[in-house]
């Protein structure tokens, strides 16, 4: 836990004004897990009551995270899409967004065309998700996130803007996917 009775005196002596703390939550959502422990919630609430700003940074899209957002005490904006967006849940609006450039669609199509074992999930800020060439990894991931997804046959069917592209393949094919990506002249333009 973040907070324990042994550490309580230390926490209570801190000045948290203008202190921003983010936590990364991916493991919490990957499997059914219990809610944030009471002791952790107490520590977070204390931190916020003393002027601290607390929130979450996640690779998840807004619809996947908003189902659990109410269970996490936060008073700061949430980082979504692996950093491509900052969202204010209480205000219900994006504060900042960075989209993939339109030419990314051609790059994605090249990967999918060259590697039939690879799939890609495409995330949009309006909560839409598209999947191109879905595989078992895609289906397992969508089962975990419970996000409605539109399956498409080509990148021409995917609207812009795109907030995040997530390639997936079985573990034995990951080296081939990574080697292919690294060999492309556009590889360094993307994270």
Predicted regions located by residue number:
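Active-site phosphate-binding/coordination module
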Residues: 37-138
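Single conserved hydrophobic/aromatic residue that forms the stacking wall/gate
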Residues: 1-7, 11
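Solvent-exposed alpha-helices and their adjacent loops that cap or buttress functional pockets
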Residues: 5, 72, 157-159
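Small/polar loops that bind or transfer phosphate-bearing groups
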Residues: 3, 56-57, 169
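Hydrophobic alpha-helical segments, especially N-terminal targeting/anchoring helices
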Residues: 3, 14, 21, 87-88
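Asp-based phosphoryl-transfer active-site loop
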Residues: 12-29
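Conserved acidic, metal-coordinating active-site core of Asp-based
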Residues: 117-119, 123-191
């Amino acid at each position: 836990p973040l907070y324990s009775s042994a550490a309580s005196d230390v926490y209570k002596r801190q000045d948290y004004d203008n202190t921003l703390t983010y936590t990364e939550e991916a493991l919490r959502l990957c499997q059914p897990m219990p809610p944030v422990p009471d002791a952790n919630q107490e520590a977070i609430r204390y931190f916020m009551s003393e002027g601290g700003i607390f929130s979450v940074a996640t690779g998840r899209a807004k619809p996947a995270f908003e189902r659990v957002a109410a269970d996490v005490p936060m008073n700061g904006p949430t980082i979504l899409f692996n950093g491509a967006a900052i969202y204010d849940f209480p205000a219900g609006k994006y504060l900042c967004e960075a989209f993939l450039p339109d030419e990314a669609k051609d790059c994605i199509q090249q990967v999918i065309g060259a590697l039939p074992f690879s799939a890609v999930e495409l995330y949009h800020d309006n909560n839409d998700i598209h999947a191109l060439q879905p595989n078992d990894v895609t289906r397992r991931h969508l089962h975990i996130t419970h996000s409605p997804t539109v399956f498409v046959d080509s990148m021409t069917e995917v609207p812009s803007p795109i907030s995040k592209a997530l390639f997936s393949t079985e573990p034995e094919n990951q080296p081939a996917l990574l080697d292919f990506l690294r060999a492309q002249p556009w590889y360094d333009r993307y994270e």
